[in-house]
Amino acid sequence: VKNEKRNPILKLGDHIKGLFKNPDRRKVKDRIMGDNGYWFESEIKKNKHVDRISRISSIDEYLRREHAILARPNFEFKGKTFETAKIILQTLKSIIRFHTGYICSNPVSLTGDKELVSFLNKVYKKGSYNKTDMEVAKELVSYGDAFEYVYLDDNDIIRSKIIRNKDSYPVYDGHGTYISFIEYWKDEETREDNYVIYYPDRVEVYENQKLVDTKVNLTGLPIWYSAMDKSRYDKFGDPFILDLIPLMDTIENLLSKLDDAVTTLSLNPLGVVSGQRIDSSIPNNIVGTVLNLEDGSDFKYASADMDRDSIKLELDYIIQQFFSVACVPSSILGQSNVSNVSETSITMLYQQTDNFCKQYIASMQEGFAKRLEYMRKLLEIKGITITDEVFDSISVSFNVNRPVDNKSDMKNMKMQHECGAMSKQTIIDRSPYTTDTSLEMERIEAERIKEEQNTSGDSQEVNRTDADMETDSKLENMIDGKAD
């Protein structure tokens, strides 16, 4: 990392002048409104965007507790309207939190050139990128896509903005090349249309079909994270949450009907009289309700015997399929008990979760590489130059939040280090107790130097003591000689 003495403000000014000095015809054409409005107004109405936004809206509604079970009708019971049970389970939120935390609850580790890693860790800390990574993972798991724009704020701090999925419209050409990005939303109070159009070199802001601001794009198009499972339009990720919603609807429907059956048939059964009822006076001193029936008549409660085994079989199978599709160990949400589990058993228990999350991690690693390129651009504008060799040494690794036997792992790494098969830096990289490798290496080096200085000081003290003893011995001999 090398600092340039050139004023970064002047460098930024040159970049702006070069951008607007000779705008090409395509840029001018983009700002001209045609008979059908601007090009981006028709772009967001295309089927591929409408299809994706409708999926996002359905997921948002479900996460806001707007489930299909709420449409279940009431019925008449004992001459009154019986309000049916509408049990809503928000298990999907727990599934999203689990996968998000599994991927990013432990901060990612940067490895490579020691000096650059230390510098980037400071950039990550100032820009609150641990939280940004969590937001990216949550958007990706929930909707199949995530969008991040890297920028330089007013205080010259590198930050990222996570653009909401329902406001995001990535644009690609007929060859599948990502060429621009539209951020669109409608103001809830004024109902005004707001557009932010991202080009590779500039950002334009429109309010009610009027261009109100144009800014220089110092980085590039928003980073597009996309899941490996694709939707009908293969550029967009397919949210796996949509696979869980039908299963959850079935579970809610079964539980709601079961609740109604218990309430009506078991707790409030219907009374049935067979025969003729006699209307005659009843003594006033009798407590309670009495039915006068003619001889041979009968009164009993009508109740239904529920097939418990069949209900349990269906419900258990649906729940089993739900956790299989969600790729979550059933013990996480209290469906089974786990005790005295070995390291091998934990690995097997989380194998499906690992395979599921590795796909998202691969997409995020690709996006993080793009983020580092954008950070490099912003650092160059600030006067900090990074060589290709140093920049290419940087890599990002994820520390998934899987329960592991840390004692066993540290013991194995210690054995490898003692055999000369692993360095201290690799141990620090893989250790669950450290996140900043370069800082730990600096501290270890400082401790080593301090110990050497202490050892050297002790050695000098010992040497001085030996010399003093030798001098004392010579003096004694001289004194004895003179005495003789």
For the regions a language model picked out, list residue spans one by one.
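Extended, non-catalytic structural segments that build the interaction scaffolds
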Residues: 68-82, 292-325, 330-332, 341-366, ...
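Extended, compositionally biased alpha-helical segments that mediate assembly or anchoring
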Residues: 441-484
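Extended, charged amphipathic alpha-helical segments
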Residues: 5, 212-348, 385, 397
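Substrate-recognition/cap regions that form aromatic- and gly/pro-loop-enriched pockets
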Residues: 370-386
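Short, surface-exposed acidic
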Residues: 330-335, 384-391, 433-444
